[in-house]
Amino acid sequence: MDDQLIDRSYFTTLYKQIRLQEFLEVAHTILQDRLENGFGKTVKGVPLGCLPVELFREHFSTFRYWRSYTKERPAFINNEKVMVQHLYFTFNARSGFPTLSSGKEWVKKKVEKKDSNNPADVAIHEYQKVTFIISIRDTRVECDFKMATNTPGSEQAQQQQQQQQQQQLGDIPIKQQITSSNNSGNSQQQQPQQQQQQQQQQQQQQQQPQQQQQQQQPQQQQHLQQQHQQQVQQLQQQQLQQQQLQQQQLQQQQLQQQQLQQPQLQQMQQPQQQQQQQQPQYTPQQLMQFQQMQQAQQQQQQAQQLQQQMGSSPTHSSPTIKQEGLTGYTQIPQGGIINTNTNLNGTGGVSPNQPMPNSSPILPTNASSVVPPVVSPPLPTSNNNSNNLGTTSPQQSNSSEISHQPIVPLNP
């Protein structure tokens, strides 16, 4: 940090107001330096006012007491060795680590004018230096503020020094002109100095509320962040509650719909069950008979088509097939079927020309009750006709042979 020329009033207000704050800021730089560069380092010119103070405020909040002492040290001012009285303020923490020190140096050098006895010509040059020192073990940090105040005659002393240098170079006429002009301007320079001091005091007063505001800003920001987090949490809780309520309402609606649909389903199922009960239930035997009837009808239709193709007359009856029974012959039309199965009630199966309902015609099963013979035209007979009555040859028993003789039952 470059040296800053300030007046005494600025130093006093600065020292009283921001002493601890600047110490804490410098302590931050020390810790960083120890981590980066190791031990035994000396850091000078640390910039102040640009580091977060609140990081280290807690570490230095347990100070017990202050201790002050003075010590004289040599210093070189204008290439002259001068003893300086250094005033230290030391802050001791409970643990004794770290030790914070601040000191201020007062350097007064009096320059007298040898040519005249006028007190206005006496030049007093005053230096004031403040050093903030923080020592942590073997690490030392120094931050300096350099101040210079000019008392009446200080400018003359500076001019005299310039004149002495000029005398060595042989410029005597220039020296006389400078001394005459400086005497006339001393009275005019005092007024601007007072005005500058007043302006600086006003600036210091304006800086105080700004510093307070800067300290309050982080606290306000933290408070606002906490409020924002609380609001976010409340909103999340409300959303969860709303979701739970919606789920409960959906479940209730589903239960109500199921309860309403159950009687409707029962009503829909009842007529279906009644229809199933009303439908007739056929046995496997009846189904087989129904299939055989369908096949017989198909065969009969095929036979009729063949007769039409052969040019047979419509008066001829369909050929019959002779079937040998136990008690006699039964004449079965080709493609037809006789149901010999009887139910418990004595009724037969389904007729070939009608469907399956219970009102199917009943066919007798006795050998005497046979299908009435179909009249066919007489054929020439031979001597063996009498012997062939009631008997059939193996060839006639074949289902493919057609008989043109009338079938007479054995048991009339």
Swiss-Prot record:
Biased region (Polar residues) positions are 177-187, 310-321, 350-363
- From the UniProt entry, list the residue stretches annotated as the region Disordered: 150-171, 177-196, 302-412
Write down the superkingdom of origin. Eukaryota
Q: What is this protein called?
A: Uncharacterized protein DDB_G0285291
**Residue spans with biased composition (Low complexity)?**
156-168, 335-345, 364-373, 381-394
